[in-house]
C-alpha cells in the first residue's frame, strides 16, 4: 500500500531543508515547519533557512579529508545544502566557506520555491502524526523536547555534549602504551599511556594554562550536568586527576612491573578498532591547545585527533537505542530523525543526515524498501556509527576516515590511504545511486 499523505518536516535548518528538498525533488509533498521568526532560539537571528550560527566554514573541500569526501557524495545526490554552499562560496584556501547570508538566502529560495514544499511558520510542540521527520537541531524548543523525552524515554535524550577526544588508532605509539584493564579484571580492554611524575607535572602545567572556548549565555550551566571538563578538574588541585581519570592504581606497567605515577586510558570506540577515545577527557579547550596538550601524553606524541573533545548545549538522542541506519525510529515506522539531534556533529554531517532521512521518508510513503547506504561511503559510515555505537558511552561524531571499514590492502602512507578510501567511497556512492 502506498501512503499518499504529505510528509511533515519539523525544522528548516541544514538537515530539515535538505530532507524537504530530497522529498520534493522525488515528487513527494512536504509541509515544512519552522518556528522562526515567530519564536527565535538563543542563537539564531534571522528567519532564513539553514542559518549558520557559528562558523561560516563547511570545512575541507579536498578529497584528502573525510568531510571533503562527504560533500562530494552529497553533490552526487543533488544536495541543496552543498549546491547553495558552492554558489555562495568565498575564498578560504582548501576549505569550503560561505557568505552566510547569501548561503541561507539561496537555501531558503530553493526550498521555499519548490512547488512541492509548503512552509508553515509556527512552533511545533508535539510529535506529529503521520510520516514526519524531526530535525529541530541542538536548540530544540522546550515544549517539543519534553515530547521527545516522553517518546524516547528520559534516559535516552541528552541536552549537553560532553565528548572526549577520539584518536586514530594507527597513530598511537604501541611501543609506549600497554593493553590492560584495571586490576586485570575481565579482558584487557584499554590501552594505557603511563606517565612518570616529571611527565605528569609538565602535562598538568600545560593543561591548566591552555586556552578554553568561551561559553555562550545559554551554555552557562553546562558543567553542572554531572560532567566536569578535565581542565576544570585539574584546576581544583594537582592531585585531583590522580584520583579520577588518571588514577594509576591497578594498572602496573607489564614492562617494569611497577605502577606508573599517572595513567591516561584509551578505550576502543568502534568495532573495527580503528578509533580510541580518551577516557574521562571531556574538555572545553580550544582545538589548537587541545592538540598540544594531548601530544604531551606518552604514546600520543604523533596522535591524529579525528574528533576533538567538546562540551556544549546540544539536544541529541541515544541513537544506538532509538534509530535504524535509515534514520527511522525503531519505535514508529513513519517517524524519522535528522541532523545534529541524531548524534552527527557538524554542518555537513547534519545535512547528510537530512538527505538520508528525506530519501527514506519518501520511500516509506511509496512502500519502497528503505535505503541503507554502504558503510564504505561517508554517508553510510556515519549512519552505521550512530546506530551501532556503544549505547552506554554514545557521544556525537563527525565525519572521519576511522569510521569506514579498512581497505583490503594495507597502505602505510596516510595521504595515499585516504586517497584510496575516497576513491572507494565515491565508486560505492555512484553504484548505489540507482537505488535512491
UniProtKB/Swiss-Prot annotation:
Record bears the keyword Transferase: yes
E.C. number: 2.1.1.74
UniProt subcellular location: Cytoplasm
Enzyme kind, highest EC tier: transferase
Catalysed reaction equations from the record: uridine(54) in tRNA + (6R)-5,10-methylene-5,6,7,8-tetrahydrofolate + NADH + H(+) = 5-methyluridine(54) in tRNA + (6S)-5,6,7,8-tetrahydrofolate + NAD(+); uridine(54) in tRNA + (6R)-5,10-methylene-5,6,7,8-tetrahydrofolate + NADPH + H(+) = 5-methyluridine(54) in tRNA + (6S)-5,6,7,8-tetrahydrofolate + NADP(+)
Residues reported in the UniProt entry to bind FAD: 11-16
Entry keywords, A to Z: Cytoplasm, FAD, Flavoprotein, Methyltransferase, NAD, NADP, Transferase, tRNA processing
NCBIfam families in UniProt: gid_trmFO (TIGR00137), PRK05335.1 (NF003739)
Protein name (Swiss-Prot/TrEMBL): Methylenetetrahydrofolate--tRNA-(uracil-5-)-methyltransferase TrmFO
The organism of origin for this protein: Shouchella clausii (strain KSM-K16)
Taxonomic path: Bacteria, Bacillati, Bacillota, Bacilli, Bacillales
Gene transcribed to yield this protein: trmFO
Amino acid at each position: 500500500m502506498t501512503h499518499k499523505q504529505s510528509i511533515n518536516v519539523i525544522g528548516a535548518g541544514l538537515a530539515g531543508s535538505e530532507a524537504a528538498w530530497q522529498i520534493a525533488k522525488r515528487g513527494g509533498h512536504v509541509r515544512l515547519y519552522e518556528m522562526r521568526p515567530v519564536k527565535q532560539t538563543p542563537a539564531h537571528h534571522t528567519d532564513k533557512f539553514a542559518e549558520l550560527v557559528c562558523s561560516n566554514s563547511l570545512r575541507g573541500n579536498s578529497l584528502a579529508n573525510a568531510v571533503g569526501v562527504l560533500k562530494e557524495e552529497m553533490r552526487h545526490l543533488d544536495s541543496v545544502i552543498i549546491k547553495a554552499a558552492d554558489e555562495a562560496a568565498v575564498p578560504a584556501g582548501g576549505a569550503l566557506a560561505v557568505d552566510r547570508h547569501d548561503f541561507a538566502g539561496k537555501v531558503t529560495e530553493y526550498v521555499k520555491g519548490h512547488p512541492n514544499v509548503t512552509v508553515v511558520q509556527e512552533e511545533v510542540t508535539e510529535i506529529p502524526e503521520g510520516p514526519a521527520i524531526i530535525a529541530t537541531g541542538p536548540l530544540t524548543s522546550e515544549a517539543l523536547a519534553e515530547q521527545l523525552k516522553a517518546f524516547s524515554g528520559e534516559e535516552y535524550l541528552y541536552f549537553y555534549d560532553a565528548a572526549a577526544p577520539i584518536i586514530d588508532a594507527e597513530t598511537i605509539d604501541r611501543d609506549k602504551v600497554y593493553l590492560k584493564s584495571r586490576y586485570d579484571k575481565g579482558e584487557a580492554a584499554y590501552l594505557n599511556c603511563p606517565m612518570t611524575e616529571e611527565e605528569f607535572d609538565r602535562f598538568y602545567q600545560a593543561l591548566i594554562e591552555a586556552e578554553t572556548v568561551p561559553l555562550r549565555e545559554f551554555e552557562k550551566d553546562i558543567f553542572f550536568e554531572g560532567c566536569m571538563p578535565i581542565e576544570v578538574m585539574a584546576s581544583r588541585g594537582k592531585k585531583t586527576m590522580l584520583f579520577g581519570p588518571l588514577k594509576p592504581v591497578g594498572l602496573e606497567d607489564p614492562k617494569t612491573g611497577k605502577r606508573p605515577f599517572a595513567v591516561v586510558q584509551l578505550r576502543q570506540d568502534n568495532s573495527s578498532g580503528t578509533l580510541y577515545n580518551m577516557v574521562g577527557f571531556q574538555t572545553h579547550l580550544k582545538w589548537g591547545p587541545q592538540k598540544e596538550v594531548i601530544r604531551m601524553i606518552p604514546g600520543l606524541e604523533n596522535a591524529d585527533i579525528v574528533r576533538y573533545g567538546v562540551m556544549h548545549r546540544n539536544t541529541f538522542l541515544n541513537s544506538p537505542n532509538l534509530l535504524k541506519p535509515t534514520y527511522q525510529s525503531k519505535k514508529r515506522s513513519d517517524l524519522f530523525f535528522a541532523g545534529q539531534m541524531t548524534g552527527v556533529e557538524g554542518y555537513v554531517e547534519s545535512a547528510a543526515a537530512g538527505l538520508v532521512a528525506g530519501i527514506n521518508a519518501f520511500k516509506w510513503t511509496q512502500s519502497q524498501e528503505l535505503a541503507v547506504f554502504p558503510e564504505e561511503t561517508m554517508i553510510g559510515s556515519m549512519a552505521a556509527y550512530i546506530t551501532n555505537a556503544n549505547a552506554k558511552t554514545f557521544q556525537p561524531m563527525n565525519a572521519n576516515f576511522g569510521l569506514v571499514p579498512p581497505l583490503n590492502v594495507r597502505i602505510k602512507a596516510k595521504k595515499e590511504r585516504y586517497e584510496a578510501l575516497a576513491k572507494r567511497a565515491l565508486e560505492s556512492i555512484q553504484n548505489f545511486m540507482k537505488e535512491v
